[in-house]
Amino acid sequence: MNVIDVIYERMGNHEPSVIVTVLSGARQGDKVVYSETGDILYGTAIEGFTMPERIQPQLFSIAQMECFLQPVEKAPEILILGAGHVSRCVADQFLFIGCGVTVVDDRKEYLKPEFFDSRVQRIHLDFKELQERLSLDSYTGIVVVTRAHEFDSVCLHQVRHVLPTYVGVMGSHKRIHHAFKVLRQEGWTDMEVNQLYGPIGLDIGAQTPEEIALSIVSEYVAVERHRKGQFLSAKRYQDEV
């Protein structure tokens, strides 16, 4: 197996890996693939190298060699439930940040190829069959943007078991308040309801479908990175105090 084979095999198994490339020095051009725990998966060990506690892209020098460390993970997979106009914009935004995207709707006419980028997987399916037909725990984020509250409710019951995976629900504050009240009446715990993101998105004053999509994807990124989505300028002022 070559380095590409090793990486693809790891990605296919949802196993992260780390590539260390020697940029200069005696082993210039060499690539070594490690597991997150430092086990060698491909190549010859770099003497003295140990896996850093925080794994992120970085340059480092060791044994008179300059090296570059690059973590490799399978692209996040997003499931979008509902195929309306906002859904199309949301799909495009998630593709833009490197996610895989699957869109599900029970209306076949809303899943035409011309409505979505060719990289989007389109599935015609009754929302009541989500749990039976899809591996829901393989998604890192689920976005519920159906056409009516009753379909939102069906979707939420279908994905309930994957919490605390990111699950966002689009709707007005009034619609979301009512929907979450009904969920509690149907047996959802406060902890489960509080793990849902609704109304979905960061408050950036979004109005158009494109802006709403930006708001939704921004919230997803903030949640995944354990951030609150505040202004960076505000953070600067806090640091100066």
Where are these regions (language model features)?
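Conserved SAM-binding strand-loop segment of SAM-dependent methyltransferases
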Residues: 120-126
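Short, well-ordered alpha-helical microsegments
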Residues: 87-88, 131, 151-153, 176
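Short beta-strand segments
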Residues: 21-23, 81, 105, 145-146, ...
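Segments forming oxygen-rich coordination pockets for charged ligands
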Residues: 1-106, 110, 114-119, 137-140, ...
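Short amphipathic alpha-helix with an adjacent loop that forms part of the alpha/beta core around
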Residues: 128-138
